[in-house]
Swiss-Prot record:
Its main location: membrane. It comes from Dictyostelium discoideum (Social amoeba). The lineage of its organism: Eukaryota, Amoebozoa, Evosea, Eumycetozoa, Dictyostelia. This is Probable lysosomal cobalamin transporter. Keywords: Cobalamin, Cobalt, Lysosome, Membrane, Transmembrane, Transmembrane helix, Transport. Probable lysosomal cobalamin transporter. Required to export cobalamin from lysosomes allowing its conversion to cofactors.
Amino acid sequence: MFPISVGWIAFAGVLLTLIALNYFIVKYYSDKHESGKITTIISVIGLTLTLLCVMLIPVDILNVSTMSHSDGTQISPYSISQRTEGVKMLYYILYGSILGVSLILVPFAYFYHEEYDENIPTCSRVYAGCKFTIFFILFTIILLVVGAFVRPGSKPIDDQNVKDWINDEVLNQNAIESSVLFAISCLTVLGFLVFAVYTSYGLSAFPIGLIKGKKRTDDDKSDINKDLWKAKEKSSFYSSKYASGKSLSEKEQSTLSLLRGKERALSKRSERLDNSNKGFRKILVIFRPFAFIFGFIFILVSLLIIISIVLSLVDKISSSVCGSACGFLSTYPQLKNPFDIILTKLAPYFPLDYIIIGGLIFFIYSCTLSGITRIGIRFLWINMFEFGYRKTFPQGLLLASVLLMLSNLCLNMQIVNLAPRYVMYGAQVYLNGTSVIPCTINAPTDLCIMSEIGLLTSRIQLGISFFGIVFYYGTWVIVATFILGLAVSIFKRRPSAALSYSGDSDEEEI
């Protein structure tokens, strides 16, 4: 087992990697004609903070796993207290920073760009941004104040060890901790909605898209030429009618205008399709078999994620401490899921578990990006902003960053469902008489130390059972939307290769 200092060195490396990765993603999607430094900085900071919350988990697990030796004995109480307080403080700093970025900085930057005009001075835009941001600041203060007064109550539990653990760890919260957790829980509820809409669809659409690929260029070209010929034929009919001296009705003039717009759009698409087979893009065809292989691997990973989540949900019903009153918190997972087994086995061999967690998070993050790209930034059926390569406006980029941040907050909770045993206690064991057994919630509180992420999620679920219930049934909704998205992805027609290289949106014209 590596010392905890190795974990913090790895975490510092991950921090730098995440900053570089998020900067690349933000610049990749930023509009090439309209990109702001404020938008870039705030988006990178917000995305990095939420991902750090998840990437801190393996370090948290290493921290608690190195508190007990292989014979079940523990390190000194002073070292335990010092190390747990350090990790807990970092979690709360990250959560508090997320609240500040998502509820204050992002709204300010959004309204700052909304007021953009060459004739409006910068100070006026700053004033307008601050004016509208005041409402979000008041909302944040209300959340924190309400959270400070919402205190967890006692639970109907018979097991004395579990009751002692709840009294010592869950009910023993100060006002600051309660307010921050309450505010983060409210944002996480929104995160479940984002996860269900974008991430669940991306988990199926991203790998299926790699497997299916784009339409064959010849077929695509043939379809475009047919549509173009039909549009020109109809347009010629109305044009010849007008040329012969007959007047066109208002409806006919509108139809002719639409047909000419369609002609222009189809001609653009045909030109892009010709360009898609030239230069470097022609070489990319060689890698098509690899895209199919990776797509097949990724869909297996997606199915493994959903299966692990379902097993965890079923297990919570059967082994919950006190049902919905405790937010479906379970003492020890009875049903073993694949990710939990793998990560628990790898926990003593850090950084192998860090690599698995990092790969899993990056995959889910990529699926969320894929979902946002495919669905767009919408409010119900209204498409607010286009989200694509080099054509996302600053306001759209900020909203996309908020969607990704909320999804990452939900992912923070879903990691507990994916690997409950690993996340709660890592590789910790304790001496029970003559045998050494894995740590659980109903183990003596002085012999097992739960990870800080395990304590935080338990405080959210037990502190206000409403959140635990919403998170539990919200996860079932995520599973259902994944199945629906999988069906849609399988039966949906392959996209045109021309659209992949579009610099301008012409969908509306067609």
